[in-house]
């Protein structure tokens, strides 16, 4: 918008963020340089200063608790609530001249001579030189544009999340942190009853985000006929969890499909008049002890914007012109990190990680 390009965001929710779900952690270090002042004053919940990992057995567990003064000195990562964060970010964009249209669902793409020329939302037709598809892991826009590879249940997981409200002082005491400081805690093992996946907990200012993620293929094939919501209920009843959330009030319940294909699950990133970003492009990385995605989405959005600015200057929105987008991403942490960890999905496909070990 600052480059005198009209930008329209079509949002199907009541407001930006109302339909978005995340575990709750944004790694800001990788995007600090490219984001500039974009995140200045952002409504972060807590700076993550403690890392915890737990292996859960049937009635027992073992864990690792790691903290470092470096975490306190540097803005490495933060817990966030998407409904708050995305709404704030949208307000900043509108101040810069971006049009945000809420309560509209994009139903189809508009085409002209084999090129994506806009979107259809209800009875409205919105024409554009470039459509940036940021419609999530199942991206029907990417599919309609012929950019999404044929995916299988193996490439997806489903996440169940709850937000439990607790007073700030109780969170500080129970998690041994000071105000403004937070904990990221990941769980493996009995939390998914031996299925591919795990559990998570992130502390917010006055709430805790916790949930379970389990592979879609594992759910379909499990002989125990366990459902994701049942895993969530059992997770909350474990001693390791119930003592941390005791007395809390459930304020939000959500579910979300998550890309698990890694580098091999990345879509074709651009075509004539269209670019895919974030989950729609498959930009997510599960390394077992670390789960990343939001910083990939932000970085890909920035690279998409730079590509469109160059395309506008050349008045060329063809697939060849927009291919600069992938070239730019290869020079950033997004495709570099995904390529470095490209064997991780196969590595984590070993069932022993979630039961025997």
Residue ranges and their predicted role:
Residues 61-82, 118, 213-219:
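Helix-loop-beta segment of a Rossmann-like dinucleotide-binding subdomain
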Residues 174-176, 246-248, 337-345:
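Short coil/turn segments at secondary-structure boundaries
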Residues 302-310:
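Short glycine/serine- and small hydrophobic-enriched flexible loop segments
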Residues 74-78, 82, 116-117, 149, ...:
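Alpha-helix N-cap/helix-initiation motif
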Residues 192-196, 205, 224-303, 316-332, ...:
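FAD/FMN-dependent oxidoreductases across multiple families
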Residues 2-3, 8, 12, 83, ...:
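Predominantly flavin-linked oxidoreductase catalytic cores and closely associated redox partners
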Residues 5, 12-59, 161, 336:
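N-terminal FAD cofactor-binding segment of flavoenzymes
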Residues 309-357:
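C-terminal helical "tail/cap" subdomain of flavin- and related membrane-associated enzymes
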């Amino acid at each position: 918008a600052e480059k005198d390009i009209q930008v329209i965001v079509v949002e199907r929710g009541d407001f930006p963020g109302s339909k978005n779900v995340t575990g709750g952690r944004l790694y800001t270090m990788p995007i600090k340089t490219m984001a500039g002042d974009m995140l200045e004053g952002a409504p972060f919940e807590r700076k993550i200063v403690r890392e915890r990992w737990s292996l859960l057995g049937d009635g027992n567990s073992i864990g690792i608790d790691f903290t470092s003064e470096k975490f306190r000195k540097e803005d490495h990562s933060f817990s966030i609530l998407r409904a708050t964060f995305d709404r704030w970010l949208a307000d900043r964009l509108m101040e810069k001249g971006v049009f945000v249209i809420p309560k509209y669902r994009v139903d189809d793409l508009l085409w002209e001579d084999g090129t994506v020329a806009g979107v259809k939302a209800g009875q409205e037709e919105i024409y554009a030189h470039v459509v940036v598809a940021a419609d999530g892991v199942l991206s029907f826009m990417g599919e309609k544009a012929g950019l999404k590879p044929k995916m299988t249940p193996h490439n997806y997981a489903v996440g169940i999340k709850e937000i439990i409200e607790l007073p700030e002082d109780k969170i500080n005491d129970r998690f041994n942190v000071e105000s403004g400081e937070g904990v990221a805690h990941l769980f493996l093992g009995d939390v998914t009853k031996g299925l591919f996946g795990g559990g998570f907990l992130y502390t917010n200012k006055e709430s805790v985000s916790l949930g379970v993620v389990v592979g879609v293929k594992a759910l379909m094939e499990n002989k125990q006929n366990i459902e994701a919501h049942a895993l969530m209920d059992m997770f909350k009843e474990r001693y390791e969890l119930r003592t941390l959330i005791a007395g809390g009030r459930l304020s939000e319940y959500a579910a979300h499909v998550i890309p698990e294909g890694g580098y091999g699950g990345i879509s074709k990133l651009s075509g004539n008049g269209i670019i895919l970003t974030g989950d729609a492009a498959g930009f997510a990385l599960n390394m077992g002890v670390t789960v990343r995605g939001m910083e990939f989405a932000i970085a890909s959005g920035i690279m998409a914007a730079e590509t469109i600015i160059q395309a506008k200057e050349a008045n060329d929105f063809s697939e060849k012109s927009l291919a600069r987008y992938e070239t730019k991403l290869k020079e950033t942490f997004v495709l570099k990190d995904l390529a470095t960890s490209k064997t991780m999905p196969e590595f984590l496909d070993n069932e022993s990680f979630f039961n025997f070990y």
